Structure formats: structure tokens, C-alpha cells
Amino acid sequence: ISDSRRDASLSDDDSFLFILDTYNDQQNGFLFGTNSSAMEYDAQIDNEGNGNRSVSRQQGGVIGGTNLNWDASWDVKSEKGDYGWSAEFAIPLKSLRFNIGKNQTWGINFQRNISKTSETAYWASLPLGFDIKRVSLAGKIDGIDLKNPKNLKIMPYVLMQSIEDKSVKDLDKTD
């Protein structure tokens, strides 16, 4: 039985993940993933998933250097067919942080989990014992030319509280 909550583990499902090292610092990245039910999984990766060792306590939702509290604005759709399943990701650039300019290089890797055979495959080969968070071993995309995306998103909401005092006080009484 699959867990359909956002950021639930994808390790027991047929799933697809990819990581973007947008600064090409070989340490940090943005991880996105899904399964055949189009569950959204995203996280910020710090220090290849090891986190900041100088910080002694962990924040809820942050495991080592994997910040699951980060919820980017993006969408994924999946389709099942005779061939298996496929997914299409739509990730606005405003959801990511990156340098602006021409001819940039980003790190990237892809991971496919096949639950039936307990197989995990990577696009950029990783030694046994490492996972997709190892951005220092990721492949590279060269020649990226990006302009500054508008980083404005309005999400109106209302939060209200009403308190009514039903007690009766005799304010005219004098002692």
C-alpha cells in the first residue's frame, strides 16, 4: 500500500527522482520525485545530505541535510499504460535559487526505483553505498542561460478568531 502524502518516502514504490545542483557547488541541491500515483516529493539537500555538523539539534522535518519542510511550488502528472508509467514535471524557475547569467553549468542526476526487482538505477553512476544526494558525483548540464524569474507569488488567506464574553458583571455596584 502506497502512502500518498506529500514528501512520503518513495523507496518502496516504483518511483523517479532527480536532483539539481543549481550552483554547481557539488554540495547542495534541490531534490524532486514522484511515483506512479503522482505524489509530490521535494527537499533541499545540504552538504550532500549530511547537513551542517556544527548544529547540534535538528529541526522537525530536517533529517541530516535533507530538509523536507521545503515545499516548492511545482506540479507533476503521471500516466499509467501498457508500457508501465510515465511522469511529467512542471517546476517554475522561481521555485529554485540559482545564479543569473550565461553559459552556466548545473549538476544533475536521475534515480529510478523499480520495486518489483528491488532495483535502483542512476543516470550518473554512483558507487555502492551512495545515493542521489551525492551531488559531487552528479552529471553536468552546460550552457544554461537564465534570466531572473519574478519571485512573487500571492497566496491570500484569512485567519480569524472570535471571542464573545457572555458573563454578566455588575459594574454599577459600589462597596
Question: Where are these predicted regions, by residue range?
Answer:
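Structural preference for beta-rich elements and adjacent junctions enriched in aromatics
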Residues: 1-175
